[in-house]
Every structure is written in C-alpha cells, then in structure tokens.
C-alpha cells in the first residue's frame, strides 16, 4: 500500500528494506503475528516486478505452489489460491487448464498481496541503517528503530562495462524491452544471452506479424546450446528446506561449486518456449522460407559493441572453441545478460 497505518509507530520487531518477492513473502508469513510487529519499506511508488518484460505469452517457470506462502503455510491469506478466490476467478482458472501460469497473472498476484498487506509501505525509501543496541533506520520521511532487519532490495540489470556507455533507444537491457521494441520493422536485431529472457525476446520477434517483423534476428549465447531449465523431480529436492539447511553449512568453495554445477535449475529455458521457437523456425525455414534472416550462434563471447556506419552497431565476439573473432552489424542490440546484486549504500552506517 502507498500509505501507512503505522505512521505513529516508531519501533518494530522486524523492519524489511525492500518489498520485492523475497521480502513480500516474509511480510506475508509474519502478517497478523502479534509478537512480531513489522513494517516493510520500499522506495518505489508502487509494486513492480519485471513490468517491461511482460511479453505476451510469457509464463512462470515454477509451480503455482511456489508462491509467497503456500509451501510454508498453506492456510496463509496471501497464497496464490487465496488471490484467485478473492478475485472471483478460481473456477475459471482451474477450467482454463494452464500448463504454466501466465507471468502477468503472477505479477498481478504479487501486487495484490502487497496492496492487501498494510505492513507493506511504498514511497518510503531507506536512506541509512545504523546500529546502537537496536537498528536505527532513517528514511526519506522519518526515523525508526527495529530489533531485526531483513534486506530484500533485489537485483539490478547487468551489462558488460564496455556496453554501459552505449545504452539507449537502440541498445538496451532486456528489462526495458517492452518500452523500446516498437520500431523493429525492417531492422537487424541482435540478442545477446542464452537464457529464458533472451529466448522470450527471440520468440517474440519471430512471432511479429508480417510488415512489422525485423529483416534479421541474430541470437548469441556463450553456452554450447540453448539449454532447457532443469525442473526435474530430484533436482527440485535442492529447493527443499532440509537441503537448504545442509547447503548453508557447507564451506564457501563447495557452495559456489554447487551453484555453478546446478545453474540450469534456475537459469535455463522453459521446454515450452524452446518447443515454440523450434516450431516457429521450422515454419520460417521450410514452409514460408525467405521471409527473414535468422542466425543462432552458441559458444560465442561478445567482447565489444562499437558504433558502426549509418547509426548501426558492430557486435564483436569470439568463438570459444576456435578463438576466431567474428562480428555482425545490428540496428538494435538487446542485452539479455541477467542481473546483479543491487548496491546497498544505505548500509554505510554499519
């Protein structure tokens, strides 16, 4: 919610910084617990979650039960099923027989939970956190204290340093895709990044109607293939509480090794997306050939992007097997290169 009923309260058992999915889950689970006075503050004016990546047809990559609270407390008032019931659409949702939840629906569910929870406050930014027997928090509106704090400020878009100075209307991170994809007709588009977001952009461009479609789409990935997400049964055991407890006790080098070995449990492409892409490529290559120039290149590492002639971009990359340098001209470059941890400048007092 944008206003707080707790403006007069200055001390809390728990104060959360940020109200994205992680802290929103915590806020949902401690809601109504009298022994746990709590407030969650977010500097944004309202809830948002990858709003500029809500491509038509994009779906969630995990089970609907992996919502804010079901696996911890199925009776909690902020479950996805509670959202469907509150909105009067639970029967329609069941009858729709979705194989995967529409991502926009899940985004709306998260926004609903944030609005329903009066302990979640938007438009209040934490500026500094200090500690003197209790945590002392300074926001853009007031000063508070708390016995415990939960940091959940999320991540921010990542691009290589050499690209950051060139970001704009024709070269941008995928997090800006819905803002800046309106002028692809007749253009050469290069997508960099072989994960789910890169796959969704590639599929979206392939599916653009005739007359609005790019003349060429070039998709580059460092990986050896466009690998699927590992959502198999035993792999999902990694995300059970018992394994989390075990994992947290491992030494740092083993935790890092485990994360590297299992990156495709969270960073692969949905099977349904891969299937749609392959079927679309089949149609464009064999049924209606010659309409668009398509290139998929794996085992390539982009080393630079330079301004070329006629306001184009020259994308330079290395073949990881042969070490040969290659390049491609593009009118539009989309970086689907993931996210990195947000800087926590407000912790300077600690």
Residue ranges and their predicted role:
Residues 54-56, 67-71, 344-350:
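FAD-binding beta-loop-beta segment adjacent to the flavin cofactor pocket
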Residues 55-60, 234-238:
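Short, hinge-like loop/turn segments at secondary-structure boundaries
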Residues 1-45, 49, 93-196, 200-350:
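Flavin (primarily FAD) cofactor-binding/catalytic cores of flavoenzymes
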Residues 55, 63-66, 109, 242:
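Short alpha-helical interface elements
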Residues 70-104, 272:
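A conserved beta-strand/loop capping segment in the N-terminal third of enzymes
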Residues 34-35, 41-42, 60-77, 86, ...:
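N-terminal/domain-start segments enriched in small and hydrophobic, helix-friendly residues
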């Amino acid at each position: 919610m944008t206003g707080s009923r707790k403006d007069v309260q200055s001390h809390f058992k728990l104060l959360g910084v940020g109200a994205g999915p992680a802290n929103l889950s915590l806020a949902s689970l401690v809601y109504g617990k009298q022994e746990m006075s709590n407030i969650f503050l977010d500097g944004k004016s309202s809830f948002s979650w990858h709003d500029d990546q809500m491509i038509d047809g994009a779906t969630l990559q995990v089970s609907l039960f992996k919502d804010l609270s079901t696996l911890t407390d199925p009776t909690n008032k902020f479950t996805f099923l509670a959202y469907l019931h509150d909105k009067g659409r639970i029967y329609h949702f069941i009858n729709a027989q979705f194989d995967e939840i529409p991502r926009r629906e899940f985004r709306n569910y998260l926004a609903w939970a944030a609005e329903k929870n009066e302990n979640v406050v938007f438009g209040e930014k934490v500026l500094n956190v200090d500690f003197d027997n209790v945590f002392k928090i300074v926001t853009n509106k007031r000063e508070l204290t708390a016995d415990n704090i939960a940091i959940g400020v999320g991540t921010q878009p990542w691009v290589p340093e050499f690209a950051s100075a060139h970001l704009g209307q024709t070269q941008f991170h995928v997090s800006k895709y819905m803002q800046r994809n309106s002028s692809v007709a007749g253009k050469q588009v290069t997508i960099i990044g072989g994960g789910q977001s890169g796959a969704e952009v590639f599929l979206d461009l392939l599916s653009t109607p005739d007359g609005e479609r790019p003349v060429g789409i070039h998709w580059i990935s460092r990986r050896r293939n466009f690998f699927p997400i590992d959502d198999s049964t035993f792999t999902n055991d990694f995300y059970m509480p018992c394994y989390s407890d075990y994992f947290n006790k491992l030494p740092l080098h083993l935790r890092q090794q485990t994360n590297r070995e299992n990156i495709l449990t969270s960073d692969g492409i949905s099977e349904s997306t891969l299937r749609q892409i392959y079927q679309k490529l089949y149609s464009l290559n064999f049924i209606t050939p010659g309409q668009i120039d398509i290139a998929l290149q794996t085992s390539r590492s982009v080393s630079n992007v330079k301004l070329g002639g006629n306001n184009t971009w020259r994308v330079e990359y290395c073949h990881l097997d042969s070490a040969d340098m290659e390049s491609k001209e593009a009118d539009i470059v989309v970086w689907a290169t993931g996210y990195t941890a947000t800087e926590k400048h407000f912790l300077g007092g600690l």
